[in-house]
Each structure stands twice: as structure tokens, then as C-alpha cells.
Amino acid sequence: MYEHMTEVKQYFTKFGGHKLAAGMSLAKRYDSLEEDVEAFRKELNECCTLTEDDLIPRVHIDVPMPVSYATKKLAEDLNLLEPFGVGNPKPLFAQKDLHVIRGFKMGAKQNFARNKVRTPEGTEVEMVFFGNIDHFADFLDRKYGIGSGASLYTTYCDFPVSVTYQLSINTYRGNESLQFIMQNYC
């Protein structure tokens, strides 16, 4: 980011940055802030080397692993790798062909869900999803027909999806259990 900022440094009184963030103070060059911003935006876009492909989000999976392989012990062992963050992301696993069979909205605002899924081998587990449940419902509607997303929370379903997930330990009323946290789906 810093390298590209140097290409338009004439627009700044000061600037700095690194791979994940940048900061700058815009120099006054024209009569109005709008003119300064527009000139800066124009030149920045002319120097931009991003392609459409660069704008496609990428998901990096650590291990394709069936949910039936996951254990509480594995989740506990993974916690030894903490602290997780930008330079040390929490491990991400994936499984294809899970069947979402039931969903339950949760939270005071009903904005996250607990989805029951069945593996190809017939094992059923629950996955918590803290992502946008409306987007997930829209995805199901596009893939399986209008109304599919809404039906997930009202009746039993059978929607094959592939997911990425993380493992954690859920502690509730003093009891610990393995928890699957769904991150991405397709």
C-alpha cells in the first residue's frame, strides 16, 4: 500500500501505511475539498494496477476435513496455537456435500443461526453461523428455489452445501462441548 501511495504523494502533506492499513493527510491544492479529492481519486485510479480478479474474495482452507473427524480434544489442541489474529489465523476446515436439514434463528435480534447438518455418512451435527443469515437464505433461494431460505427455519429440509468451518469449545452452564462455527458456504 505504501508503495502505491508514493506514486501520488504530491497529494499528501504526510502519509504512511503497511500491508493492512494506510493513513494520509490530503494537501490543499485546489479551491475546494471536493476538487482536491476528485483530482486525487482520478490520479489514484489511473495508477491502480488492481484487476477484477484481485477483487474476488479468496478463502484459504487449512485442511479439507470431514466434520466427523473433529473432536473436542482436537479443538482443545488447536487452542494451544492462540493467540489468533491477522498473522496467525484460526484454522479453517472444509467439507463438501453437507446437507442442511434444519435451521434455528438465535439471538435477541434473531440475527444468527444454529443449523443442523447431515454428513454424507449420515452423522448429524449442529453448526453455529454468525454470518448474515439473510444472505444465506438468499443463497438457498438462488440455488434451490424461491422460499428455500425461509423454509430452513420452519420445517425440515435437505439442501446440499459445501462449507468452511472452525472448531471451538462452547462452555454453557459449566459444561463444555465441541462447537462447529460455519464461516463460508457454496
Language-model features, listed with the residues they occupy:
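Acidic, two-metal ion nucleic-acid-processing modules in DNA metabolism proteins
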Residues: M1-F15, K19-C186
